[in-house]
Structures are given as C-alpha cells and as structure tokens.
Swiss-Prot record:
It is an enzyme of class 5 (isomerase). It comes from Edwardsiella ictaluri (strain 93-146). One of its GO terms (cellular component) is cytoplasm. This is Glutamate-1-semialdehyde 2,1-aminomutase. Its cofactor is pyridoxal 5'-phosphate.
Length: 427
C-alpha cells in the first residue's frame, strides 16, 4: 500500500468519501485518488514523490501553472499585512477596477468566495430585479451546488425541475426549467409557456461540466435575443471560461453581451475567490444601495485579492492567449492523429485553454445527450493508462481539461506519445 492509499483509507474515516469535493474521489474512473504533496509549473507530485504532467490545473484556476512566483510573492506580501480585516481595503478597489476593465459587460462587480456563491447571488439578484421566480438552465451545465441549481432534466425539450439530490425540496426546484444546450427551440418553448414568469437564463458559454461543449453558431446570441424579447436577464456563468478562452472571457470570444456575469477560478489565482457583476442599474439593486441582500464575512479577503490581482495582471499581456490556444491546438491535433493511427474513434473539442476528450464514433459532440452516447468505460481505461505514464487528466468523462502557460511543447509531446501507447492498448 503506497502513501496515497494509506492516506485515503484514513481520510475515509474522517471525511465523507475521503474527499472534500466528490469528483476528487475517482468515482468516475475507479481506483484510489492521488494525494498531492506539491506542485510546480505544469507538474504535480504525489505523496509518494511521483511526478505528473497536470491537465486538471486545480479544475481551472492555474492558467499560469502551479506555484507561479509572481502570485506566490504577492500572497506572501499580503499575509505579512494581515489575513483578514472584515473591512474594505484598497486592494478590493484595485481588483474591481481591473476586472471591470477586462470584462466589457461589467460596470460593477461584487466579490464572493466561490463560483457557487457567485451564481447563487446572481440568480437572487435577477429574481429580485425582475420580480420573477423562474429560471432557465441547461441540461448538463453545472452552476454550483445551490438548491435551485441541482436539478435534472426529464424527457422532452421542456421540463419542470425535479431535485437532483436528496435534501433539495421539490418546491425549490419547481422554479427551475431545464432546456437542451445548443437548442434554441427548447428555450423558445419555455418562454412561450411562461412568458411573464422567467427571471433569467443562466448558461455556461462553453459547457465545461459535460466535458467541453462549445456553443453552436448563433446559440448565445439567440439567448440574448430571447431575454430581450421577454424581459429576462441573461446570466453568463464564466466561472470556468472567464479569462481562460479569452482575456475578456467567452463573451468576448463569441461576441455576446450578458446582463450579469459570474466569475471564479482564474480570478483568484488559486485562492478561493468568486465574483459577479454586470449592468450598473442591476448591480445597484444589491444591498446596501438596494433591497436585494447579499453578504459574506470573507468576501474580498485581502490575501485572495492579492493573488487574483497578481494573476490577472500577468495574463493581461500581449501574446498570452494565442500562446495558450496554440498549446491546446497542438495537444488536440496530436491526440486525434494518434487515435487515427490506432483506429480509435475520438472527438476532441477545444476552445482557448480548454479541451475535452470523447471516445465516440459520432462526428461531433454538441450536447449532453451526445456526451451520454460516448464510451465512458473506454475513457476509464484510458485515464488509468495515462496516469500510469505520468499524465494527470480529469478523473471523469464529464469534466473538461485545462492547459496552462507553464506547459511546454515537450510536455505536449510526452502527452501525445503516452496517448498513442494508451490507444494501442485500448483496441
């Protein structure tokens, strides 16, 4: 039994499932999760000292790679001034100034502690601002673990929400309408049925929790038009895509303007930070200037703000996003070429610094139902074959992979070579 296995056995007696977030338990792929000792650049080192090329990146935040010296130094300096004050700081102002300068649709922003807090707060704000209760989300999209968002879709294009987890009252879920991602007709049907009751649409502009599903041409723009037509707000959940597919987020990349935007992951530079923001008239409805309540003891934490500010300044440089996209393109093309050589049917979706690997003979993967038709068992085998060769992919067929600026062409080539070897064993 190695150290990770020993730690996992101990953890299971103290922490539910041995982990503090379910996907880390390797439930989707089987086996024992790695316990990580340290990380640097594009590499993780487990409790037994084995190194891995990392494509999880702490589930998205590590766009600069692990333990980046600029972020590390900023955090050390901030810690020296105090861990938390419970009062406003200049860094909060500087951070808000930077974020609103980078995201064109955000006139104002409020900091929170996680992506879940950001989406939960944005939806409350949308409901309060519009005076309506219902919201539209999309099958296969994840927006955190707030009660009204843990909803699954039933049959048909339009489904009144049913709880997706015990502990979520049906009365909470009934206001959540689930439509099909990349299917505007399902959204039109929802608005036709509830024309005066829908407060908002919330959408991942690139769906990253059914692996990686980009929007079809016109999909996001169609959502914008429907919101305008029916007086609803468009919330773009950029917790995953913000500062990853483009400096101005996926909304810049796909040229769509939301009313509210949710941010997380990269905005914290590896620290727990979320944010939501948007049109001034909507944001000013928040307390203390407006009646809609939202608060947080550690929101705008000075250490977290220092990390996020340092990270955003580092990526706000010429050439960063072309470099990130080139690395991702090279990986995707190499994986597809290796799969063709070994006659393994494969689709690789990728946008900016995100990618998704699908074992399928479908020509494309564009929605949740397409994802369900992929070969999850083959992915499990592939994951472990890659792990044995020192390549750490997301331990789930439903999670996107992430590139960092710390990955080298040598890392990419090693990954492609490992994939070729793995594909040969999957026949």
């Amino acid at each position: 039994m190695n150290k990770s296995e020993r730690l996992y056995e101990q953890a299971k007696t103290l922490i539910p499932g041995g982990v503090n977030s379910p996907v880390r338990a390797f439930t989707g792929v089987g086996g024992t999760p790695l316990f990580i000792e340290r990380a640097d650049g594009a590499h993780l080192y487990d409790a037994d000292g084995k190194a891995y090329i990392d494509y999880v990146g702490s589930w998205g935040p590590m766009i600069l790679g692990h333990n980046h010296p600029v972020i590390r130094d900023a955090v050390i300096a901030a810690v020296g001034r105090g861990l938390s004050f419970g009062a406003p700081t200049e860094m909060e102002v500087r951070m808000a100034e930077l974020v609103t300068s980078l995201i064109d649709s955000m006139d104002m922003v409020r900091m929170v502690n996680s992506g879940t807090e950001a989406t939960m707060s944005a939806i409350r704000l949308a409901r309060g601002f519009t005076g309506r209760d219902k919201l539209i989300k999309f099958e296969g999209c994840y927006h955190g673990h707030a009660d009204h968002l843990l909803v699954k879709a039933g049959s048909g294009a339009l489904t009144l929400g049913q709880p997706n987890s015990p502990g979520v009252p049906a009365d909470f879920a009934k206001h959540t309408l689930t439509c099909s991602y990349n299917d505007l007709d399902s959204v039109r049907a929802a608005f036709a049925r509830y024309p005066q009751e829908i407060a908002c649409i919330i959408v991942e502009p690139v769906a990253g929790n059914m692996n990686c599903i980009p929007p079809q041409p016109g999909f996001l723009q169609g959502l914008r038009e429907l919101c305008d037509q029916y007086g609803a707000l468009l919330i773009i959940d950029e917790v995953m895509t913000g500062f990853r597919v483009a400096l101005g987020g996926a909304q810049e990349y796909y040229d769509v303007t939301p009313d509210l935007t949710c941010l997380g992951k990269i905005i914290g530079g590896g620290m727990p930070v979320g944010a939501f923001g948007g049109r001034r008239e909507v944001m000013e409805a928040l307390a203390p200037t407006g009646p809609i309540y939202q608060a947080g003891t550690l929101s705008g934490n000075p250490v977290a703000m220092a990390a996020g500010y340092a990270c955003l300044n580092e990526i706000n440089q010429p050439g960063i996003y072309p470099q990130l996209a080139e690395l991702t393109d090279n990986l995707a093309e190499g994986l597809l070429a290796a799969a063709r050589e070994e006659k393994i049917p494969l689709v690789v979706n990728h946008v900016g610094g995100m990618f998704g690997i699908f074992f399928t003979d479908q020509p494309s993967v564009t929605c949740y139902q397409d994802v369900l038709r992929c070969d999850a068992e083959r992915f499990k085998r592939f994951f472990h074959l890659m792990l044995e060769q020192g390549i750490y992919l997301a331990p789930s067929a439903f999670e996107a992979g992430f590139m960092s600026l710390a990955h080298s062409q040598e890392d990419i080539q090693k990954t492609i070579d490992a994939a070729r070897c793995s594909f040969a064993k999957l026949k």
